[in-house]
Amino acid sequence: MLMDAPGIREELYDMARRLATAGYAVLLPNLYYRAGKDTKYGKEVLEHGSAEHARMRSVRTKMTIPPVMEDLASMLAYVDAVDEISSGPVGVHGYCMSGPYALAAAARYPDRVTAAASFYGTWLVNDDAEESPHRTFGQVKGELYISCAEVDDLAPMEMVEKLKQLFELSGAKGEIEIQPGVVHGFAFPNRWCYDKPAAERHWERLISLYRRNLS
């Protein structure tokens, strides 16, 4: 499970715990670790213009896909070394900034990452980014699920429509689904944008994806 831009917080730990109750070992890494230990932000991180938001953005804007793929390799090695975790296929899912990371992982490690999901992922079509998901769909062997909010300035419908066309042309296995009437962040229970029906659908689709592909 890959974090969104505001970083590691209790809300994400709760979501990881919920997934664990379905029978999965869940890793929730701090992807900002390269910036040092002081990368857990206060509630003000969600307020544009706040000092915490600016501090987070100074780290977030330096994030790119290739280093995160190196982190995924380390996580796969860690999973293999833990006796209590079954070896074999793994799933990766991400929210917001980590949506493209999850999809890129399925392309970079196609024999290991057999299921990947993006929820309101940003920059899924980015011609300037190495390993942008829209370029690597054809390398994926597993199943992908991409869930987009109908109202999302960070992932507008123009991008989603282009993504759908490229996804279909790639022949990749999976689905792109638009959640009607909801906004970016709909799955986060502690945020103003939370939408319970869409959030519960997110859990249903994620867990069913993993059950199909991780057994």
Feature-to-residue mapping (PLM):
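N-terminal cap/leader regions of alpha/beta-hydrolase-fold enzymes
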Residues: 1-215
